[in-house]
Amino acid sequence: MTLTFSMPVHSDDELGQLCTAFDTMREELLKSNQELWRQAEERKRLNAAFSHDLRNPITVLKGTIKLLRQGTADEQAIDRLESYTLRIEQYAEAMSSIQRLEQMPVRINEYSYSLLHSELEETAKILAGALEPSVSAPDKGTIQLDHGLVLTVAENLIGNAARFAKSKIEIHLERKGNFLHLSVTDDGPGYPVELIQSGPKPFGKMKEDSAHFGMGLYSSQILCLKHGGTLTLENSKSYGATATASFQINQKP
């Protein structure tokens, strides 16, 4: 059944009001179906990535077990066995974490820009204090959003920038239309081209940090989508990289 049709309303009588109510219900059903479809496609992509990235650890484990059975395994083989077992454990924990994010409800409440500004400053001080990060945000007004969700994304982006920045991080918060934009810029080496072109992947390693599995950026992307927004990554022409998270919002002047 398609829900892309519309019901034009030509009068304000009971029939017109009924048509308006049906059209509102249709729009909500369409939005719900689109979200379910997006989640199903994302789950399919995630499962494929999980299966693909498990192949190498499992192959190494099989080879090491074979050496153990033959009695030819050395201490290095035992270390390798422990290392790859830990990797599989991390993959499993990541899968569980992503599932919890997808099921997390969005709770909208009203907050002041000044509160968000101070919390961003505190987060930046904790995660990137040595880099003397700068934070800019509107001084007045309130905004309606999921406070915890937005701060979680901010923590992920600031923490990621702190790992790669050379000397500074700039954090900027602003409203554009019906969206709140949070951008985090660093002066590090920039994002890999593949990451910018394909977007964050749940288990995508970055060469600069072999312990980083891309979960921070990937989970931020999921949270932005849940809040009706997006996550975009780009490299600066002069230096560094910028991650911009957008969130659909309702704002009071």
Task: Annotate each language-model stretch with its function.
Residues 179, 190, 237-244:
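Glycine-rich nucleotide-binding loop
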Residues 168-178:
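Short beta-strand/loop element within the Bergerat-fold HATPase_c
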Residues 49, 53-57:
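H-box/DHp (HisKA) helix C-terminal flank immediately following the catalytic phospho-histidine
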Residues 191-204:
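Short conserved segment of the HATPase_c
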Residues 1-48, 61-70, 100, 214, ...:
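Membrane-proximal HAMP signal-relay module
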Residues 186:
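Acidic ATP/Mg2+-coordinating residue in the GHKL
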Residues 171, 231-234:
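Short hydrophobic beta-strand elements within the C-terminal catalytic ATPase subdomain
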Residues 35, 39, 58-164, 171-172, ...:
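DHp/HisKA dimerization helices and adjoining segments of the cytosolic kinase module
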